[in-house]
A protein has these predicted regions:
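Membrane-embedded transport module
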Residues: 1-123, 142-143
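C-terminal transmembrane module of polytopic membrane proteins
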Residues: 86, 91-183
Length: 183
């Protein structure tokens, strides 16, 4: 239950921090609502459902709220700043809006899958299957034309896809490093 709580609170943290940053800085929000639906489904909702049903051999330890917040708030901040930075950089170098939004959606979803990987480490069995299926779902959303159109995505260029993977990997590494310090 603690890992699933961390997952859902991380989403709440990045959503709140990103909304505050966009409002305070007077920036355009980096997503359409459809993008949030896709990212949230693949990196929080669907995996959260399956992960909550899996057996958890860990015993209860006092300090649930503190541990959960000490993970979720910094992880959410890292994701929010990463997504905002990605979007600002894309705009700065002249990437069209649809591509910038797709890039931000990819970074958000992949960083969310990184959070699941961190929380469920070491991955094995069903946990690996869940993360792999969600990553495959993201790829399918990009390559199936009617799904891509429904979610208002564009096929990223190879450079954009590589950038999204690299940026999400850096965000995941930052979250993993932060996690190692707060345990």
């Amino acid at each position: 239950a603690e890992r699933v709580a961390k997952l859902f609170l991380t989403k709440s943290a990045w959503a709140m921090i990103l909304a505050l940053l966009v409002a305070l800085l007077g920036l355009r929000y980096p997503f359409l609502p459809r993008h949030i639906t896709l990212a949230g489904s693949l990196s929080i909702g669907i995996p959260g459902f399956f992960l909550a049903l899996m057996p958890n051999p860990r015993l209860y330890r006092p300090g649930f709220v503190e541990r959960t917040l000490r993970f979720a708030v910094p992880a959410g901040a890292i994701i929010a700043f990463t997504v905002l930075g990605t979007n600002l950089a894309a705009e700065r170098i002249g990437i069209p809006t649809a591509h910038a939004q797709t890039l931000s959606t990819l970074v958000l979803t992949l960083a969310g899958l990184g959070v699941i990987t961190i929380l469920e480490w070491p991955l094995s069995g069903w946990r690996t299957a869940v993360v792999s299926a969600m990553a495959a779902g993201l790829v399918l959303a990009l390559v199936i034309p009617f799904v891509r159109e429904f979610f208002a995505l564009v096929v990223p260029t190879p450079a954009e896809a590589a950038a999204a993977l690299g940026i999400a990997a850096l965000a995941t590494a930052a979250i993993a490093a932060m996690t190692a310090r707060v345990r």
